[in-house]
Amino acid sequence: MNHLEIEFKTMLTKEEHDRLLQLFADISPISQTNYYIESDQQSIRHAHMAFRVRTFKHHEAELTLKIPQEVGALELNQNLTPEETENILQNNEFPTGEILETLLQKEIPIQDLKILGSLETIRYEKEDKIGLFALDESHYLGKKDFELEVEVEDFEKGKENFLDFLKQHKIDYKPGKSKIARFSENL
Protein backbone atom coordinates (compact mmCIF):
# COMPACT_ATOMS: atom_id res chain seq x y z
CA MET A 1 0.00 0.00 0.00
CA ASN A 2 1.39 3.38 -1.00
CA HIS A 3 0.20 6.80 0.03
CA LEU A 4 1.33 10.40 0.27
CA GLU A 5 1.89 11.23 3.93
CA ILE A 6 1.36 14.87 4.89
CA GLU A 7 1.79 15.27 8.62
CA PHE A 8 2.47 17.89 11.23
CA LYS A 9 3.98 17.21 14.60
CA THR A 10 5.01 18.91 17.77
CA MET A 11 7.10 17.64 20.62
CA LEU A 12 5.31 17.61 23.96
CA THR A 13 6.26 17.75 27.60
CA LYS A 14 5.07 14.84 29.73
CA GLU A 15 2.48 17.17 31.27
CA GLU A 16 1.14 18.21 27.85
CA HIS A 17 1.02 14.57 26.75
CA ASP A 18 -0.88 13.57 29.88
CA ARG A 19 -3.31 16.46 29.43
CA LEU A 20 -4.02 15.51 25.80
CA LEU A 21 -4.40 11.87 26.83
CA GLN A 22 -7.82 12.84 28.22
CA LEU A 23 -8.98 13.42 24.61
CA PHE A 24 -8.08 9.79 23.86
CA ALA A 25 -9.74 8.32 26.97
CA ASP A 26 -11.97 6.05 24.85
CA ILE A 27 -9.03 4.74 22.77
CA SER A 28 -6.92 1.67 23.53
CA PRO A 29 -3.21 2.26 22.94
CA ILE A 30 -1.28 0.54 20.17
CA SER A 31 2.17 -0.78 21.06
CA GLN A 32 4.56 -0.76 18.12
CA THR A 33 8.28 -1.15 17.63
CA ASN A 34 10.21 0.47 14.79
CA TYR A 35 13.43 -1.22 13.69
CA TYR A 36 15.50 1.22 11.67
CA ILE A 37 17.50 -0.04 8.72
CA GLU A 38 20.64 1.58 7.33
CA SER A 39 24.12 0.79 6.02
CA ASP A 40 27.43 1.79 7.59
CA GLN A 41 27.81 4.19 4.65
CA GLN A 42 24.40 5.73 5.51
CA SER A 43 23.19 5.11 1.96
CA ILE A 44 19.51 5.41 2.96
CA ARG A 45 20.06 8.77 4.66
CA HIS A 46 22.20 10.08 1.79
CA ALA A 47 19.32 9.21 -0.56
CA HIS A 48 17.07 11.29 1.79
CA MET A 49 14.90 8.29 2.63
CA ALA A 50 13.87 6.45 5.79
CA PHE A 51 13.58 2.65 6.01
CA ARG A 52 12.07 0.59 8.82
CA VAL A 53 10.27 -2.53 9.92
CA ARG A 54 7.35 -1.81 12.25
CA THR A 55 6.04 -4.64 14.41
CA PHE A 56 2.81 -4.74 16.35
CA LYS A 57 1.30 -7.10 18.88
CA HIS A 58 -0.08 -10.35 17.46
CA HIS A 59 2.96 -10.78 15.16
CA GLU A 60 1.79 -8.24 12.57
CA ALA A 61 4.53 -6.29 10.80
CA GLU A 62 5.14 -4.00 7.86
CA LEU A 63 8.15 -2.81 5.92
CA THR A 64 8.13 0.92 5.12
CA LEU A 65 10.24 3.09 2.87
CA LYS A 66 9.61 6.85 3.05
CA ILE A 67 10.68 8.98 0.11
CA PRO A 68 10.40 12.77 0.46
CA GLN A 69 8.24 14.63 -2.05
CA GLU A 70 7.75 18.34 -2.70
CA VAL A 71 4.94 18.19 -0.13
CA GLY A 72 4.99 15.32 2.35
CA ALA A 73 6.54 11.91 1.82
CA LEU A 74 5.63 9.00 -0.42
CA GLU A 75 5.24 6.06 1.92
CA LEU A 76 5.70 2.59 0.43
CA ASN A 77 4.32 -0.07 2.78
CA GLN A 78 4.55 -3.83 2.46
CA ASN A 79 2.88 -6.22 4.90
CA LEU A 80 5.22 -8.90 6.19
CA THR A 81 4.65 -12.50 7.18
CA PRO A 82 6.19 -13.61 10.50
CA GLU A 83 8.87 -15.47 8.50
CA GLU A 84 9.74 -12.38 6.43
CA THR A 85 9.93 -10.28 9.58
CA GLU A 86 12.29 -12.75 11.23
CA ASN A 87 14.44 -12.93 8.08
CA ILE A 88 14.85 -9.16 8.12
CA LEU A 89 15.47 -8.81 11.85
CA GLN A 90 17.75 -11.83 12.22
CA ASN A 91 19.44 -12.18 8.82
CA ASN A 92 19.07 -8.79 7.07
CA GLU A 93 17.25 -10.57 4.22
CA PHE A 94 14.60 -8.43 2.53
CA PRO A 95 11.53 -9.81 0.72
CA THR A 96 10.88 -9.14 -2.94
CA GLY A 97 8.42 -6.41 -3.77
CA GLU A 98 8.13 -2.74 -4.66
CA ILE A 99 10.31 -1.59 -1.76
CA LEU A 100 13.23 -3.83 -2.70
CA GLU A 101 12.83 -2.81 -6.36
CA THR A 102 12.86 0.88 -5.40
CA LEU A 103 16.01 0.46 -3.30
CA LEU A 104 17.74 -1.33 -6.17
CA GLN A 105 16.66 1.38 -8.65
CA LYS A 106 18.18 3.97 -6.32
CA GLU A 107 21.39 1.88 -6.22
CA ILE A 108 21.20 1.22 -2.48
CA PRO A 109 23.62 -1.60 -1.58
CA ILE A 110 21.08 -4.07 -0.17
CA GLN A 111 23.80 -6.42 1.08
CA ASP A 112 25.13 -3.64 3.38
CA LEU A 113 21.81 -2.90 5.08
CA LYS A 114 21.33 -3.86 8.72
CA ILE A 115 19.16 -3.10 11.72
CA LEU A 116 20.54 -0.11 13.66
CA GLY A 117 18.26 -0.55 16.65
CA SER A 118 14.70 -0.08 17.75
CA LEU A 119 12.29 2.52 19.07
CA GLU A 120 9.17 1.47 20.98
CA THR A 121 6.05 3.62 20.89
CA ILE A 122 2.82 3.61 22.85
CA ARG A 123 0.40 5.28 20.43
CA TYR A 124 -3.14 6.55 20.78
CA GLU A 125 -4.80 7.21 17.39
CA LYS A 126 -7.99 9.11 16.80
CA GLU A 127 -9.67 10.39 13.64
CA ASP A 128 -10.88 13.98 13.90
CA LYS A 129 -12.20 16.54 11.42
CA ILE A 130 -8.62 17.87 11.17
CA GLY A 131 -7.14 14.47 10.33
CA LEU A 132 -5.72 11.36 11.98
CA PHE A 133 -4.15 12.28 15.32
CA ALA A 134 -1.43 10.17 16.94
CA LEU A 135 -0.38 10.84 20.53
CA ASP A 136 2.94 9.07 21.11
CA GLU A 137 5.23 8.15 23.96
CA SER A 138 8.48 6.76 22.53
CA HIS A 139 11.34 4.89 24.21
CA TYR A 140 14.74 4.44 22.56
CA LEU A 141 18.37 4.17 23.61
CA GLY A 142 17.56 4.99 27.24
CA LYS A 143 15.53 8.07 26.28
CA LYS A 144 11.82 8.87 26.40
CA ASP A 145 9.95 11.57 24.49
CA PHE A 146 6.41 12.63 23.70
CA GLU A 147 4.87 13.99 20.51
CA LEU A 148 1.59 14.74 18.82
CA GLU A 149 1.22 14.12 15.09
CA VAL A 150 -1.66 14.72 12.75
CA GLU A 151 -1.85 13.28 9.25
CA VAL A 152 -3.85 15.50 6.89
CA GLU A 153 -5.02 15.59 3.28
CA ASP A 154 -4.25 19.26 2.52
CA PHE A 155 -0.96 20.91 3.58
CA GLU A 156 -2.11 24.52 4.04
CA LYS A 157 -5.46 23.78 5.67
CA GLY A 158 -3.90 21.03 7.79
CA LYS A 159 -1.15 23.31 9.08
CA GLU A 160 -3.63 26.03 10.01
CA ASN A 161 -5.96 23.57 11.75
CA PHE A 162 -3.08 21.91 13.62
CA LEU A 163 -1.72 25.21 14.93
CA ASP A 164 -5.27 26.24 15.96
CA PHE A 165 -5.66 22.93 17.80
CA LEU A 166 -2.42 23.52 19.70
CA LYS A 167 -3.45 27.07 20.60
CA GLN A 168 -6.87 25.87 21.77
CA HIS A 169 -5.16 23.34 24.06
CA LYS A 170 -2.54 25.84 25.29
CA ILE A 171 0.40 23.97 23.77
CA ASP A 172 3.32 25.85 22.24
CA TYR A 173 4.39 24.49 18.88
CA LYS A 174 7.76 22.78 19.33
CA PRO A 175 9.08 21.49 15.99
CA GLY A 176 10.23 17.91 16.19
CA LYS A 177 12.45 15.80 14.03
CA SER A 178 11.22 12.46 12.79
CA LYS A 179 11.51 9.45 15.08
CA ILE A 180 14.31 8.01 12.96
CA ALA A 181 16.23 11.31 13.14
CA ARG A 182 15.84 11.49 16.93
CA PHE A 183 16.89 7.85 17.20
CA SER A 184 19.92 8.33 14.92
CA GLU A 185 21.12 11.42 16.81
CA ASN A 186 21.38 9.29 19.95
CA LEU A 187 23.32 6.35 18.50
Language-model-detected regions and their locations in the chain:
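Phosphate-end processing signature that detects enzymes handling 5′-triphosphorylated RNA
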Residues: 1-187
